[in-house]
């Protein structure tokens, strides 16, 4: 326990909180251009071909971003919006592309959880 005199001299130090998404620079989303669109395999014990793109952001950062949902229309030079949110089984992928924004289309024939995939309400 610190004495009153020690606290007067120094004060309590606040712990420095490190961001999980440094490339966003405290913004909710950032725009960027795809430099590479590819698939990669997840860590054990999972098995899949996960769709990922490398994005050069407007602030100069280059990051890997996961493309969620079934099927996408992204290719090199597509302009995308990215948000934070890591993919647990893909090391180094700390961002998600926002479906239905800018050049990234929404998921076709999506009926549930549509807002997360930029899908319009189906005509019933």
UniProtKB/Swiss-Prot annotation:
HAMAP family: Ribosomal_uS12_B (MF_00403_B). CDD domains: Ribosomal_S12 (cd03368). Residues 105-124 are annotated as: Disordered. With S4 and S5 plays an important role in translational accuracy. Signal peptide: none annotated. One of its GO terms (biological process) is translation. PANTHER family: 30S RIBOSOMAL PROTEIN S12 FAMILY MEMBER (PTHR11652). It holds the Pfam family Ribosom_S12_S23. Part of the 30S ribosomal subunit. Contacts proteins S8 and S17. May interact with IF1 in the 30S initiation complex. GO terms for molecular function: rRNA binding; structural constituent of ribosome; tRNA binding. Keywords: Ribonucleoprotein, Ribosomal protein, RNA-binding, rRNA-binding, tRNA-binding. Residues 113-124 have a biased composition (Basic residues). InterPro entries: NA-bd_OB-fold (IPR012340), Ribosomal_uS12 (IPR006032), Ribosomal_uS12_bac (IPR005679). This is Small ribosomal subunit protein uS12. The keyword tRNA-binding applies. Belongs to the universal ribosomal protein uS12 family. One of its GO terms (cellular component) is small ribosomal subunit.
């Amino acid at each position: 326990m610190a004495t009153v005199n020690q606290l007067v001299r120094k004060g309590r130090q606040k712990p420095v909180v490190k961001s999980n998404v440094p490339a966003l620079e405290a913004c909710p989303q950032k725009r960027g251009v795809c430099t590479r669109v590819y698939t990669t395999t997840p860590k054990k014990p999972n098995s899949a071909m996960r769709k990922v793109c490398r994005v050069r952001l407007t602030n100069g950062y280059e990051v890997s971003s996961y493309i969620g949902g079934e099927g996408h229309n992204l290719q090199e030079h597509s302009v995308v919006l990215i948000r934070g949110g890591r993919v647990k089984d893909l090391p180094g992928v700390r961002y998600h592309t926002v479906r239905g924004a800018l050049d990234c289309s929404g998921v076709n024939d999506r009926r549930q959880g549509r807002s997360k995939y930029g899908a319009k309400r189906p005509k019933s």
